């Protein structure tokens, strides 16, 4: 992308002034041009801007507002401009402020008076609102596809490790045994909800502002439903003031993105922990690790650490845009020019984070022996003992909890596991305990017993993964 900040800037400033400067005696200062220009970032809207202009021109011709010849010239000119931008031959000018005026000025250069008719019954207010909605809609579709890919990777890993034990944690302390597959499927559920939130945001944003003009609509006999349909919107927006003055569609998108980034950050944090030497549950290949400039032995999980950090960009974008919008009276204010950069940056961060997580999940090697060894540590089957007391001896759960707690204390004082206590030790706390108690104290027994819906039993994990893979295969 080439942005022309100096060469011809005076000429371009005059041309920009010609777009809106009829009542001005002089042009903007260099500082005013710099602070006013958004072309440095909104050039990414060029595809959406051209698409919106093509739909608008077709509607103007259909309704008799411009001639068919003018519409044909506009279509030809915009198509050629699109090819120029695609090929990197378009010089964007800071003096022309934004993507809209850059394209319009170039169009007028190419086709003359017909290009100046394009902006009939349109304002930059409804133009940018339309472009931005189109861009966010495209971004949602792209991120949704990436999230679905990550979900598939997680499901396939979960199937592979549906029966491989690992410690489940609360407070990062050993709690109960689960399977690695069950743990991974938790993130599939989170990502499924993330995609649902993005889909909800997409549905609400899919109304077309074009035709709202500056804020009050237009006196020209336009057909807003025609342009809405041409651009893939469900309907035109219902209120012209609302259409040009709100960015809640972008805020909702950033909110959904922030929640998804938080989930990716949590997954990445766990990968960092699992890769650490004290855990050593998984290993990432050289493709997703880096070394140290001084310590030759180091293999750092930098990809995971960077994903963990990128949530700051995404949530920062949400807070930033909320702050921009919170005090604005209706309708449009120039403050709203600051809406796009945070959305673009957050989208880039989310896309890169999804790609990195997808790559890491497909790349990692699970150390199942290490996980299995730790799965039984920290008295992780204590709840199984308490459940046995309730189920077999009919003790109230709170009583069983206290009995089990005393047995844990005894085992801990001796430096042994629960299963290393003798039957006599256990009967000293609860006389009704029999030899059968030891059968529930194994990791495998604990995991196999968790057959409740959503539980960690291997068959549950396999069924959950298969269900999600079927859903994803059907494009949902």
UniProtKB/Swiss-Prot annotation:
<dbReference type="GO" id="GO:0004056">
    <property type="term" value="F:argininosuccinate lyase activity"/>
</dbReference>
<dbReference type="InterPro" id="IPR008948">
    <property type="entry name" value="L-Aspartase-like"/>
</dbReference>
<dbReference type="InterPro" id="IPR020557">
    <property type="entry name" value="Fumarate_lyase_CS"/>
</dbReference>
<dbReference type="GO" id="GO:0006526">
    <property type="term" value="P:L-arginine biosynthetic process"/>
</dbReference>
<keyword id="KW-0055">Arginine biosynthesis</keyword>
<dbReference type="InterPro" id="IPR024083">
    <property type="entry name" value="Fumarase/histidase_N"/>
</dbReference>
<dbReference type="InterPro" id="IPR029419">
    <property type="entry name" value="Arg_succ_lyase_C"/>
</dbReference>
<keyword id="KW-0963">Cytoplasm</keyword>
<keyword id="KW-0456">Lyase</keyword>
<keyword id="KW-0028">Amino-acid biosynthesis</keyword>
<dbReference type="Pfam" id="PF14698">
    <property type="entry name" value="ASL_C2"/>
</dbReference>
<dbReference type="InterPro" id="IPR000362">
    <property type="entry name" value="Fumarate_lyase_fam"/>
</dbReference>
<dbReference type="InterPro" id="IPR022761">
    <property type="entry name" value="Fumarate_lyase_N"/>
</dbReference>
<protein>
    <recommendedName>
        <fullName>Argininosuccinate lyase</fullName>
        <ecNumber>4.3.2.1</ecNumber>
    </recommendedName>
</protein>
<dbReference type="InterPro" id="IPR009049">
    <property type="entry name" value="Argininosuccinate_lyase"/>
</dbReference>
<dbReference type="GO" id="GO:0042450">
    <property type="term" value="P:arginine biosynthetic process via ornithine"/>
</dbReference>
<dbReference type="GO" id="GO:0005829">
    <property type="term" value="C:cytosol"/>
</dbReference>
<dbReference type="Pfam" id="PF00206">
    <property type="entry name" value="Lyase_1"/>
</dbReference>
<comment type="similarity">
    <text>Belongs to the lyase 1 family. Argininosuccinate lyase subfamily.</text>
</comment>
<comment type="pathway">
    <text>Amino-acid biosynthesis; L-arginine biosynthesis; L-arginine from L-ornithine and carbamoyl phosphate: step 3/3.</text>
</comment>
């Amino acid at each position: 992308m080439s942005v022309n900040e100096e060469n011809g800037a005076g000429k371009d400033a005059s041309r920009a002034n010609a777009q809106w400067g009829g009542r001005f005696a002089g042009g903007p200062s260099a500082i005013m041009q710099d602070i006013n220009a958004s072309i440095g970032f909104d050039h990414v809207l060029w595809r959406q801007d051209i698409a919106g202009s093509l739909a608008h021109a077709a509607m103007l011709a259909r309704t008799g507002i411009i001639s068919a010849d003018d519409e044909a010239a506009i279509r030809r000119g915009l198509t050629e401009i699109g090819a120029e931008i695609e090929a990197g031959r378009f010089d964007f000018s800071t003096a022309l402020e934004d993507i809209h005026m850059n394209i319009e000025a170039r169009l007028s250069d190419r086709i003359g008076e017909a290009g100046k008719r394009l902006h009939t019954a349109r304002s930059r207010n409804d133009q940018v609102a339309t472009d931005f909605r189109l861009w966010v809609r495209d971004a949602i579709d792209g991120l949704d596809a990436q999230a679905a890919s990550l979900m598939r990777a997680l499901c396939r890993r979960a199937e592979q490790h549906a029966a491989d034990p690992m410690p489940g944690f609360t407070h990062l302390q050993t709690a109960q045994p689960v399977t690695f597959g069950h743990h991974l499927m938790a993130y599939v559920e989170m990502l499924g909800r993330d995609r649902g939130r993005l889909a909800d945001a997409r549905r609400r944003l899919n109304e077309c502002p074009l035709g709202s003009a500056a804020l009050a609509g237009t006196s020209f006999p336009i057909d807003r439903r025609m342009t809405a349909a041409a651009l893939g919107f469900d309907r035109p927006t219902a209120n012209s003031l609302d259409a040009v003055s709100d960015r809640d569609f972008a805020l909702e998108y950033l909110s959904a993105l922030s929640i998804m980034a938080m989930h990716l950050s949590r997954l990445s944090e766990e990968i960092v922990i699992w890769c650490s030497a004290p855990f050593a549950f998984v290993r990432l290949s050289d493709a997703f690790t880096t070394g140290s400039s001084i310590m030759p032995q180091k293999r750092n999980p930098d990809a995971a650490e960077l994903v963990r950090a990128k949530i700051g960009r995404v949530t920062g974008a949400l807070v930033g845009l909320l702050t921009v919008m919170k005090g604005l009276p209706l309708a449009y204010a120039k403050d709203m020019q600051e809406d796009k950069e945070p959305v673009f940056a957050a989208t880039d961060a989310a896309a890169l984070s999804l790609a990195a997580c997808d790559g890491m999940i497909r790349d990692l090697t699970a150390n199942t022996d290490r996980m299995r060894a730790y799965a039984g540590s920290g008295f992780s089957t204590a709840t199984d003992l308490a459940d046995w007391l309730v189920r077999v001896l009919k003790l109230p759960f709170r009583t069983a909890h206290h009995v089990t707690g005393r047995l844990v204390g005894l085992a801990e004082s001796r430096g042994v596991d629960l299963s290393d206590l003798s039957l006599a030790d256990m009967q000293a706390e609860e006389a009704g305990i029999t030899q059968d108690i030891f059968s529930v104290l194994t990791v495998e027994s604990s995991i196999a017993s968790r057959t409740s819906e959503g539980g960690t039993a291997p068959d549950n994990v396999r069924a959950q993964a298969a269900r999600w893979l079927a859903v994803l295969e059907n494009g949902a």
